[in-house]
Amino acid sequence: MTAQASNIVWHKASVDRESIEKERGHKSVIIWFTGLSGSGKSTLANALNVALFKKGLATYVLDGDNIRHGLCNDLGFSDSDREENIRRIGEVAKLFLDAGVIVLTAFVSPFRSDREKARKLVKENDFLEIYCAANLDICETRDTKGLYAKARAGEIKDFTGISSPYEEPENPDLKIDTGLKDIDQCVEEVISKLIELNLVK
């Protein structure tokens, strides 16, 4: 990584977050979905995106695969690259937060320390960690890309759940059994949590 740039100044937005939230009628928040590959993070994030959009809310999905096509296409899957991947996502999510958007991030984000760093970028009530809890067997049966099979065959190195660890959240804001519940139930659980926290109506 290059040295940190100097002689730069943060420019405050001409329209602040509070004004945007007041105009739109809802708060912005980072909803951070974490879990194994195949646990349903992207599926749930996108289904929730549709549900919130239908309510007239401003939302955006940051998906792990999509981000690696552009912003993070220079990163691999070593521990240090995973850390940098999540650091970048945390910063991007913070920008969306300031823009008054409900940002839905769907990343394996296997290490607790990296998720905690992302949380600490914003205020306590601005970050909601949701653990998509599905056991490894279920995740493997959902693997349409064949990634788990390749990992078990040694064709993919540093694959979370097989050759690289996943550190489960110790105290997530919400834990959903995405292995057994259908997508509508999962979406309803998240929306109920958002209502409970007065983030949406």
Swiss-Prot record:
Catalytic activity: adenosine 5'-phosphosulfate + ATP = 3'-phosphoadenylyl sulfate + ADP + H(+)
UniProt keywords, alphabetically: ATP-binding, Kinase, Nucleotide-binding, Phosphoprotein, Transferase
Catalytic residues identified in the record: S109 (phosphoserine intermediate)
Pathways per UniProt: Sulfur metabolism; hydrogen sulfide biosynthesis; sulfite from sulfate: step 2/3
Amino-acid positions noted as binding ATP in the UniProt annotation, renumbered to this chain: G35, L36, S37, G38, S39, G40, K41, S42
Enzyme Commission code(s) on record: 2.7.1.25
Keyword match ATP-binding: yes
HAMAP family documented for this protein: Adenylyl_sulf_kinase (MF_00065)
Protein's name in the database: Adenylyl-sulfate kinase
UniProt gene name: cysC
